[in-house]
From Swiss-Prot:
This is Large ribosomal subunit protein bL12. It holds the Pfam family Ribosomal_L12. Forms part of the ribosomal stalk which helps the ribosome interact with GTP-bound translation factors. Is thus essential for accurate translation. InterPro entries: Ribosomal_bL12 (IPR000206), Ribosomal_bL12_C (IPR013823), Ribosomal_bL12_C/ClpS-like (IPR014719), Ribosomal_bL12_oligo (IPR008932), Ribosomal_bL12_oligo_N_sf (IPR036235). It comes from the Bacteria. GO terms for biological process: translation. Keywords: Ribonucleoprotein, Ribosomal protein. One of its GO terms (cellular component) is cytosolic large ribosomal subunit. One of its GO terms (molecular function) is mRNA binding. PANTHER family: 39S RIBOSOMAL PROTEIN L12, LARGE RIBOSOMAL SUBUNIT PROTEIN BL12M. Belongs to the bacterial ribosomal protein bL12 family. The lineage of its organism: Bacteria, Bacillati, Bacillota, Bacilli, Bacillales. Homodimer. Part of the ribosomal stalk of the 50S ribosomal subunit. Forms a multimeric L10(L12)X complex, where L10 forms an elongated spine to which 2 to 4 L12 dimers bind in a sequential fashion. Binds GTP-bound translation factors. Disulfide bonds: none annotated.
Length: 120
């Protein structure tokens, strides 16, 4: 049951602000994106800026390769073949440009199943 673009737009026009807010949150969670506009940051002369975007890198799968592949699929949304290739070719970046909290969550999930992970 595929919807065409006109039907989707009509549904969005009829939705309340609360429903649209829920839709945005669901899209952000489903696709791992954010609806926030990029903020231009003026370069400060002296101090080093705090890092806000992180890369989660799988260093190695450890002993539980199958469990690591399952978690990689869950985190990235990749298919079985792609997730296996990523794990086999470690070290590889799993997620780039993620918030510190999300990076730490991903690291914890992978380390829980025996993988070696770095957050950069």
């Amino acid at each position: 049951m595929a919807l065409n673009i006109e039907e989707i737009i009509a549904s969005v026009k009829e939705a309340s602000v609360l429903e649209l807010n829920d839709l945005v949150k669901a899209i952000e969670e489903e696709f791992g994106v954010t609806a926030a506009a990029p903020v231009a940051v003026a370069a400060a002369g002296g101090g080093a800026a705090e890092q806000t975007e992180f890369t989660v890198e799988l260093s190695s799968a450890g002993d539980s390769k199958i469990k690591v592949i399952k978690v990689v699929r869950e985190i990235t949304g990749l298919g079985l073949k792609e997730a296996k290739e990523l794990v086999d070719n470690a070290p590889k970046a799993l997620k780039e440009g993620v918030a510190k909290e999300e990076a730490e969550e991903i690291k914890a999930k992978l380390e829980e199943v025996g993988a070696n992970v770095e957050v950069k």
